[in-house]
């Protein structure tokens, strides 16, 4: 933080916790998401703020043809990849839960939300992005803050304002197959107020019988996405969009993902299993490759 005032980290941390409690928690029965899921099959009134988030989220789901889908929470919990019992589910279990997956199973009418019976919402994939957007709103009310870089868990980054020396904010991108945490694929330059999100199969996964099962699910199959991509980094104007787009692009793969990014005016970087890096036109101006084992290739249109 570049500020002339008191330390704002405490206030910012509280805002993030409030978002987790209010919008993201499945376990807190007082959270709006928990109440929505408990009322599956009925219509529930939500806050204007949550209604605004949901409108954007479901537009992203539609624009990505369901590659990003906020109704996939049951599938994620069945695999339990980030829990104590990660495992490959039986196909019969997946088939049963897939009946309740599909963004079309949720209807929005202003601040009224209706979930078809059995459908549930999980905003975890956009949680950090929503947090970044909320932090930006807060920083814009603080006249003594001129610039800031916020890193929420490594995968979501927000820059605010310009550094005093006028230089770009440089954000390192992880090499998806790095042996050490300090081995980076390259650096992305951010300028002014921008949002960056990364999705990769190296973040959360388990290996069974030599197969890597990661946490980014394909809503159409109920299995970890197989698009040939190992990592995607997106830069755009809001944190929510950056998070959702990086997830969708990971599921879609390079060509379809790049087309989606065009509709949002976002920049993207795709890494594939053969150590190729694909950059959209805007990302070519931002990205500097550091890893010698990778090569930059053109995206085929």
Locations of the language-model features?
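Mature catalytic core of soluble alpha/beta enzymes
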Residues: 1-301
């Amino acid at each position: 933080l570049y500020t002339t005032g008191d330390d704002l980290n405490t206030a910012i941390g509280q805002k993030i916790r409030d978002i987790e409690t209010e919008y993201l928690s499945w376990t807190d029965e007082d959270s709006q998401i928990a109440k929505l899921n408990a009322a599956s099959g009925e219509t529930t009134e939500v806050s204007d703020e949550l209604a605004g988030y949901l409108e954007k989220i479901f537009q992203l789901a539609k624009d990505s043809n369901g590659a990003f889908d906020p109704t996939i929470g049951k599938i994620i919990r069945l695999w339990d990849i980030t829990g104590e019992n990660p495992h490959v589910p039986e196909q019969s279990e997946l088939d049963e839960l897939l009946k309740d997956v599909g963004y079309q199973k949720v209807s929005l009418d202003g601040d009224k939300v209706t979930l078809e019976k059995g459908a549930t919402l999980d905003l975890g994939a956009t949680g950090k992005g929503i947090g970044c957007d909320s932090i930006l709103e807060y920083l814009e009310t603080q006249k003594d803050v001129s610039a800031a870089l916020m890193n929420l868990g490594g995968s979501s980054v927000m820059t605010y304002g310009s550094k005093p020396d006028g230089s770009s904010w440089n954000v390192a991108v992880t090499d998806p197959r790095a042996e050490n945490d300090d081995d980076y694929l390259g650096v992305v330059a951010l300028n002014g107020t921008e949002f960056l999100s990364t999705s990769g199969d190296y973040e959360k996964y388990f290996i069974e019988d030599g197969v890597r099962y990661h946490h980014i699910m394909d809503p159409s199959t109920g299995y970890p996405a197989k698009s040939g991509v190992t990592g995607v980094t997106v830069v755009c104007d809001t944190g929510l969009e950056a998070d959702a787009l990086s997830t969708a692009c990971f599921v879609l793969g390079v060509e379809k993902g790049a087309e989606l990014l065009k509709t949002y005016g976002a920049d993207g970087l795709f890494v594939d299993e053969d150590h190729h890096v694909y950059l959209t036109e805007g990302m070519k101006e931002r990205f500097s490759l550091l890893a010698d084992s990778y090569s930059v290739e053109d995206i085929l249109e």
